């Protein structure tokens, strides 16, 4: 009888400890915004969070943020991601450059025209965009395989990848299936990369409609959302393109359409709203960087900018953890 009471008492104590642990630890979500090569700054933020012992429970990412966030969700450390940014031949990967044609000024093979190995025109497709992104997708798939996380279901941290459906003019959040294909879709800048066909959808860069997906991370269950914003130009509410008037985002896929989108930015209201809703807003200072600033020296500089920005917000994060 005494033994039975002791056993029940032990179980109750264990349950109490578990409940206390769950109550003490608010769920932390990490949002990786889009910004091309500037994504290196997000690695700098991760370095600071790791050093501070911050446990991330949910991740949402757009464009380059989907790559950094997805790989972190798979178990890659900030140090490993730093090495990736500083050593990968990003230009060749992203452009599907054919090394065998790198010395050829002009060559056409199977309807695709190459200039010094870079694809510039595809006569076989009626969708604007030349690069397939196959090289970078294969690299990402290999990196995910190393961690045993090729599918969303096997990731170490729950992850949502933001894309945009060019036919329906709708944001599409992917959280199941192939992680590398979702990443490839999320980074497919219209007019440069071909859209990714997934089920009955044609998907492009999620930054078209949601470049800082704080709302997505919140819906995943995050109590505290840390957002990393790579946008450098000050954005203000303005007259926008009414997406409901477009038959699809495909209407924006010509050169003129891309310029119109850049001018009107149909995602601005959502971006500003998400920025305000972030509990911790980290904004690396990258005045001389742009989406194409790849390379070892640029990566090192942007990573350091991420470190500086994250350290500035650490006290705010500590206060948020106490308040929750």
Q: What residue ranges belong to the model's regions?
A:
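Patatin-like phospholipase
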Residues: 22-62, 70-324
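Bacterial N-terminal signal peptides that target proteins for export
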Residues: 1-9
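Bacterial N-terminal signal peptides
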Residues: 10-20
């Amino acid at each position: 009888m005494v033994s039975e009471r002791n056993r029940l008492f032990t179980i109750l104590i264990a349950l109490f400890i578990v409940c206390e642990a769950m109550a003490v630890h608010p769920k932390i979500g990490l949002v990786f915004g889009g910004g091309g090569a500037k994504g290196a700054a997000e690695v700098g933020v991760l370095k600071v969070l790791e050093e501070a012992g911050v446990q991330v429970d949910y991740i949402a990412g757009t464009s380059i943020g989907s790559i950094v966030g997805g790989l972190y969700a798979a178990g890659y450390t900030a140090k490993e991601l730093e090495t990736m940014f500083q050593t990968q031949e990003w230009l060749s990967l992203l452009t599907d450059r054919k090394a065998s044609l790198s010395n050829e000024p002009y060559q056409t093979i199977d309807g695709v025209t190459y200039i010094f190995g870079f694809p510039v025109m595809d006569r076989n497709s009626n969708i604007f965009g030349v690069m397939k992104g196959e090289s970078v997708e294969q690299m990402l798939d290999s990196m995910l395989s190393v961690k045993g996380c090729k599918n969303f279901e096997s990731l170490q941290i729950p992850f949502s990848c933001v894309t945009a459906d060019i036919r329906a003019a709708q944001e599409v959040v992917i959280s199941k299936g192939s992680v590398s294909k979702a990443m490839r879709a999320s980074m497919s800048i219209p007019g440069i990369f071909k859209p990714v066909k997934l089920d009955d959808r044609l998907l492009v860069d999620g930054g078209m409609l949601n470049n800082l997906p704080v709302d997505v991370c919140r819906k995943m269950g995050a109590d505290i959302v840390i957002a990393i914003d790579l946008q450098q130009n000050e954005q203000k509410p303005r007259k926008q393109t009414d997406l409901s008037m477009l038959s699809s985002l495909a209407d924006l896929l010509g050169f003129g359409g891309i310029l119109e989108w850049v001018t009107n930015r149909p995602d601005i209201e959502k971006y500003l709203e998400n920025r305000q809703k972030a509990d911790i807003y980290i904004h690396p200072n990258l005045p001389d960087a742009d989406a194409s600033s790849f390379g070892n020296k640029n990566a090192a500089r942007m990573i350091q900018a991420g470190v500086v920005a994250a350290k500035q917000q650490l006290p705010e994060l500590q206060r948020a953890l106490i308040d929750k």
